[in-house]
């Protein structure tokens, strides 16, 4: 059964579970400020094609390491809430954390249809690094489309990786397209295909199909978000990110998600610490796709999270945070060796 076939079951079970938690009145996140990073230092970085990218950062500007977090499809930077919250305490002044909204997401600007590509997202990440972290060592952390973004940057800028990147985390992502599996297979629908053509050919009539397309796409993304019972507040939070993403943006990125191929980038990551993490209940990017990518990274730490859905960093934040702490420890060792003139994997 494909993802669309699961929707009725998942939605019914999900509603029942959420109602059970609500009746118990013990939602652990009832009073959680899930938009914590709205109070962090903010700036706007202009992408190479003029699209404004919203950036937030926390930690000393002169920290020896900058960790750049890149969010996924139909999300925004606050999807890293639990990492921003916990890792600031864990890493202290040794790491500056940088977060940004990808083009067409969150508070960043709307892109043209032609620029909704993994290639362009890699260029956007490069622009963010040039603007806010032009010097020093980097750890790059990406979830879903954010992981693809990091691989795109790696292919485009192997010099940057060689000289400055000392660690990479790839969460719930893949190096190859999703046309035949996961999201691509689940959204193989003539209505969505027609809307995609309309966006390019007749932007003025796009409004007519927005509701229909959202009704097809949103349930797919919602059902795949979590593999276990989670806080109703968390469900509402992730759903708000999906709902706040323009349908035009959602559809315009589908083709690049289906067809991208960044396998060539993996060879540039074999000599630095890498963490690959995935949930075995992820229907957006199936476990097999993530593990296939990991095979090209024999020294990577592979963390398989039982029962986790696609939003592993929200569903199992403690496991993700622990993996990132381990990555930073390995990356710090690489930094020390590079500073002493020796190069090699940590």
Whereabouts are the PLM-identified features?
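An N-terminal hydrophobic leader/cap segment in hydrolases
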Residues: 2-44
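Conserved HGGG/HGGXW glycine-rich cap/lid loop of the alpha/beta-hydrolase fold
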Residues: 51, 56-110, 131
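Active-site glycine-rich loops that stabilize anionic/oxyanionic intermediates
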Residues: 72-76, 143-145, 174
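Active-site loop/oxyanion-hole signature of alpha/beta-hydrolase fold enzymes
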Residues: 95-148, 155, 159-161, 322
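Flexible "cap/lid" loop of the alpha/beta hydrolase fold
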Residues: 155, 159-204
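Conserved alpha/beta-hydrolase catalytic His-Asp/Glu region
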Residues: 203-268
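Short beta-strand/loop motif that positions the catalytic acidic residue
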Residues: 269-270, 276-278, 282
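Catalytic active-site module of serine/aspartate enzymes centered on a nucleophile-bearing elbow/loop
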Residues: 298-346
């Amino acid at each position: 059964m494909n993802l669309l076939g699961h929707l009725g079951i998942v939605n019914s079970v999900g509603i029942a579970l959420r109602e059970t938690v609500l009746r118990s009145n013990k939602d652990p996140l009832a009073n959680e400020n899930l938009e914590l990073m709205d109070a962090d230092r903010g700036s706007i970085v202009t992408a190479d094609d003029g699209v404004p990218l919203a950036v937030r950062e926390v930690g000393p500007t002169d920290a020896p390491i900058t960790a750049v977090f890149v969010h996924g499809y139909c999300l925004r930077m606050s999807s890293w809430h639990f990492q921003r919250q916990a890792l600031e305490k864990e890493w202290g002044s040794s790491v500056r954390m940088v977060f940004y909204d990808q083009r067409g997401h969150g508070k960043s600007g709307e892109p043209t249809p032609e620029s909704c590509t993994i290639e362009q997202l890699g260029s956007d990440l490069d622009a963010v690094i040039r603007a806010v972290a032009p010097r020093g060592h980097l750890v790059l952390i990406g979830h879903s489309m954010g992981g693809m973004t990091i691989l795109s940057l790696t292919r485009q800028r192997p010099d940057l990786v060689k000289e400055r990147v000392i660690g990479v985390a790839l969460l719930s992502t893949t190096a190859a397209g999703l046309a035949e599996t996961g999201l691509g297979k689940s959204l193989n629908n003539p209505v969505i295909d027609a809307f995609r053509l309309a966006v390019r050919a007749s932007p003025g009539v796009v409004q007519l199909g927005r509701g229909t397309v959202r009704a097809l796409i949103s349930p797919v993304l919602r059902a795949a978000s979590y593999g276990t019972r989670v806080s109703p507040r968390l469900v509402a939070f992730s759903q708000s990110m999906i709902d706040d993403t323009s349908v035009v943006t959602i559809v315009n990125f589908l083709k690049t998600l289906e067809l991208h191929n960044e396998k060539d980038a993996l060879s540039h990551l074999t000599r630095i610490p890498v963490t690959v993490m995935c949930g075995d209940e992820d229907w957006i990017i199936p476990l097999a796709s993530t593990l296939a990518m990991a095979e090209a990274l024999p020294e990577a730490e592979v963390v398989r999270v039982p029962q986790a859905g696609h939003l592993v960093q929200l569903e199992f934040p403690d496991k993700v945070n622990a993996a990132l702490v381990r990555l930073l420890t390995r990356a710090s060792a690489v930094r020390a060796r590079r500073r002493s003139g020796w190069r090699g994997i940590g």
